[in-house]
């Protein structure tokens, strides 16, 4: 029986942060079973070279490398090089880009290294990734390192449990909040009532969530009830250590290799400077904290000037536990561990709803007095204290109302009857994104919602980009034959705008409410400037996606020729996930033309974060920096939000496109992208 990696580490000296460059181009990895014990939880885990995580692979940009993987398991395996731009046949997804590695067989991956930065590898077979088949990748730049540091550490954040993935899935299919032991209760009602401004608002909040068969406290599907959160596979009671000397510059390469957990990372008393996101350099951003989604990577630099220990604190998003480490000038020296923040509580914003105009009696399963929810009453709703304040860059109730955003000549009050607009027919409106089955033409549509300088969303429209406002509408469903844009009051088009026909739009419209889709976000908003649930009022500088600006412009300056709109959907009660209301088994491939420039727009109809990963390509997140939009391989889609990214389909083949919460992917939130 092999000795557990954590047992080996317990007697080893802490790493000193000096990683010699590698000249190795031929690698051999063995996948097999190793008995691993972490925090008293023992598992006969699938491992690479008998360790969790697997060995660090260090490459150099411009080289061609060869990696032979031998499978000693009794089942198929594979390795995917997460974030690396490789040929499709080397991407490592069985059944899609290759046949997988059968028991007793080997496969040699061979590909050129076209990039540099921090990445990782993991299995794409049989949920082996959830049990430890992971490892880090560092790629040195072909040119001299632009951010030289005295020390360099890899920090892999993860979870550990001895409960099998199959059992976890079975439990959540039986009861979606099976691992949520922090439900609201009768005992918590007085405190909630005090927070919400009275018993009635608190009860209304609970009734709304009950009517939707959802829980406002269900933040993470799987929690610290069974997970031990780890840092480099070391439990918090031991904690990872890294040495330093005062005054040194230290590079920390954070990789979220977890199965289901988003982490909020900080080092109390020490400023971090973000220098790279998903391996790509960004303009330096000084921060106190950042949220890292599953599969994301961030490189930060710290420079401690005091000769004492600093705690690396990575709390789970649901605040049921944390991973722990220490930067220390001497072995065994520790710093205080900060308390965890209060647990986040979801609001109707996370459901993509217009909170001012909600009529609770019309919600499924609700029978309430005729008392509409107004903006004045929203101040008493649960967790509104967690909403950003007016001087922040995030959405407030005032900014969501946005009376100053009304278009000249257009009455935008929420009693507006769209049926009176020329050419607007009942058939046309019913097919517009955001319209619900049975919604009449004269029903309230709500106000325009502010998103970002480049994103304005009108209820009933998908308009993530002002320069192609009409492109997000289902133009075929509208009778426009006798109507020009110039005829619409207050909608004179700038002469520099491209004609609406310049952008081909693939928009399926909102998915139906059925067994596979529990909710439609009628008012999705841009949340790129929002640090995430639970982080808005911490008095700490928290990284947001709007802070990320690439150091170099996009290599492809072309505008997109096509926009593909995808809804992220699911049914929490049945634990089913998908795109556009369909599971993977019910969906065909997304077909792209070779070298096509495409915009993907994601509308999150669920109350959960989804880290979305497109294999094989950079996703250029449209966060307002134009040519300097950051290039990422994994992007968090926040609940009730809309966002978009550009990509260039410059590599032919079949590619995976999925949520990187493993159980969401396994239960349907997976698509294929075909480039030919």
Q: Regions from the language model: what does each represent?
A:
Residues 204-232, 472-549:
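Intrinsically disordered, low-complexity acidic Ser/Thr-rich regulatory segments
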Residues 121-124, 309-316, 655-660:
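A short beta-strand micro-motif common to beta-rich folds, especially ectodomain repeats
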Residues 255, 299-311:
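A conserved active-site cap/scaffold subdomain adjacent to cofactor or substrate pockets
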Residues 2-294, 301, 331-448, 454-459, ...:
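Histidine-centered copper-binding motifs that mark active-site loops
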Residues 114-115, 304-306, 650-651:
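Surface-exposed, short loops/turns at beta-strand junctions within beta-sandwich domains
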Residues 26, 39-40, 83, 89-98, ...:
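Active-site pocket scaffolds in enzymes
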Residues 73, 258-259, 306, 606-608:
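Short, acidic/polar linear motifs in exposed loop/turn regions
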Residues 127-133, 309, 316-324, 663-668:
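Short acidic/polar inter-strand loop motif in beta-rich domains
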């Amino acid at each position: 029986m092999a000795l557990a990696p954590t047992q080996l580490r317990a007697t080893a000296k802490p790493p000193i942060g000096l990683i010699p460059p590698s000249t190795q181009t031929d690698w051999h990895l063995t996948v097999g079973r190793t008995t691993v014990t972490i925090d008293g939880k023992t598992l006969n885990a699938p491992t690479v070279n008998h360790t969790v995580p697997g060995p660090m692979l260090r490459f150099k940009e411009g080289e061609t490398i060869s990696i032979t993987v031998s499978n000693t398991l009794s089942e198929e395996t594979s390795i995917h090089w997460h974030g690396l731009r490789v040929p499709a046949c080397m991407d490592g997804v069985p059944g899609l880009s290759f046949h997988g590695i059968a028991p007793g067989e080997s496969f040699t991956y061979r590909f050129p290294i076209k990039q540099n930065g921090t990445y990782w590898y993991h299995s794409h077979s049989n949920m082996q990734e959830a049990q430890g088949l992971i490892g880090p990748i560092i790629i040195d730049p072909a040119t001299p390192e632009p951010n030289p540091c005295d020390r360099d550490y890899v920090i892999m954040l993860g979870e550990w449990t001895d409960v099998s993935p199959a059992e976890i899935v079975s439990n959540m299919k039986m009861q979606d909040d099976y691992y949520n032991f922090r439900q609201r209760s009768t005992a918590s009602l007085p405190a909630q009532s005090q927070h919400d401004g009275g018993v009635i608002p608190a009860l209304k909040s609970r009734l709304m969530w009950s009517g939707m068969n959802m829980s406002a406290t269900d933040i993470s599907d799987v929690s610290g009830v069974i997970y031990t959160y780890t840092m480099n596979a070391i439990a918090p009671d031991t904690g990872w250590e890294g040495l330093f000397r005062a005054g040194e510059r230290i590079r920390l390469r954070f990789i979220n290799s977890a199965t289901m957990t988003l982490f909020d990372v900080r080092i109390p008393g020490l400023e971090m400077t973000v220098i790279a996101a998903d391996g790509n350099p960004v303009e330096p951003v000084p921060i106190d904290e950042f949220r890292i989604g599953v599969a994301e990577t961030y490189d930060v630099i710290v420079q401690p000037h005091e000769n004492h220990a600093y705690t690396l604190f990575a709390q789970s998003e649901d605040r049921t536990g944390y991973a722990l480490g220490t930067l220390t000038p001497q072995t065994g020296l520790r710093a205080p561990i900060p308390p965890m923040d209060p647990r986040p509580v979801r609001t109707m914003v996370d459901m993509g709803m217009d909170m001012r105009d909600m009529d609770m009696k019309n919600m499924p399963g609700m029978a309430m007095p005729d008392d509409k929810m107004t903006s004045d009453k929203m101040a008493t709703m649960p967790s509104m204290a967690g909403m950003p304040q007016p001087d922040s860059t995030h959405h407030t109730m005032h900014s969501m109302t946005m009376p100053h955003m009304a278009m000249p000549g257009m009455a935008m009050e929420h009693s507006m009857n769209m049926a009176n607009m020329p050419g607007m027919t009942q058939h046309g409106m019913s097919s517009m994104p955001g319209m619900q089955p049975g919604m009449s033409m004269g029903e309230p549509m709500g106000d325009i919602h502010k998103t970002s300088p480049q994103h304005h969303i009108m209820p009933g429209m998908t308009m993530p980009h002002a320069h192609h406002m009409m492109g997000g509408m289902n133009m075929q469903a509208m009778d426009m034959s006798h109507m020009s844009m110039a005829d619409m009051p207050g909608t004179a088009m700038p002469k520099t705008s491209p004609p609406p026909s310049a952008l081909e739009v693939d928009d399926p419209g909102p998915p139906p409410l059925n067994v596979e889709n529990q909710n439609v976000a009628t008012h999705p908003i841009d949340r790129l400037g929002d640090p995430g649930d639970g982080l808005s009022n911490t008095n700490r500088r928290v990284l947001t996606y709007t802070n990320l600006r690439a150091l170099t412009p996009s290599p492809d300056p072309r505008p997109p020729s096509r926009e593909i709109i995808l809804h992220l959907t699911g049914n929490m009660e049945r634990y089913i996930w998908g795109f556009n209301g369909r599971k993977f088994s019910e969906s065909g491939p997304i077909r792209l033309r070779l070298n096509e420039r495409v915009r993907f727009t994601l509308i999150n109809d669920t109350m959960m974060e989804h880290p979305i990963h497109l294999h094989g390509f950079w996703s250029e997140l449209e966060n307002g920096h134009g040519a300097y939009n950051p290039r990422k391989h994994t992007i968090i889609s926040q609940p009730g939000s809309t966002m978009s990214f550009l990509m260039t389909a410059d590599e032919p083949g079949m590619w995976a496109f999925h949520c990187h919460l493993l159980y969401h992917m396994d239960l349907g939130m997976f698509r294929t992208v075909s480039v030919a």
